[in-house]
Each structure stands twice: as structure tokens, then as C-alpha cells.
Amino acid sequence: MIRYIKEDSQYFYVVTERGQTSSMSKNHARLVNSNSRTWTIERWGYAYTYDEKCNLIESHKY
């Protein structure tokens, strides 16, 4: 489960309840939503939802 998401100018960092961290390049994206299981970013008019290990779950027009 996701504990929190932090970000800097280049990366999103997903920290789990077990203390594990996964990272993903921002590449002009912004964080729009997160909960304990998934997180969603918006980039160039599309939304991308990922799990705690930064695996893509779904994408759609935003």
C-alpha cells in the first residue's frame, strides 16, 4: 500500500508502508490523485494510473 508520494523537479517517488521506494520520471507530468493503492498523473491531456510499483494500470483522455 502507498504511504505517500513525494516529488522533485524530475521524479515522482512512491513510498510504501513497508518503506520501499519506487521512482518514475516526471517528464512534464503533474500528480492529480492518489490513494493507498493507486496514483494518477496527467500529461499532455491524458491521465495515467499506476500502482505502488509504478506499473501502468490504465490510461485515458483527461
Can you name each region flagged by the protein language model?
Residues 1-7, 12-14, 35-49:
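Short beta-strand elements that form the blades of beta-propeller/WD-repeat-like
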Residues 11-27, 49-61:
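Surface-exposed loop/turn elements that mediate protein-protein interactions on large endomembrane-trafficking
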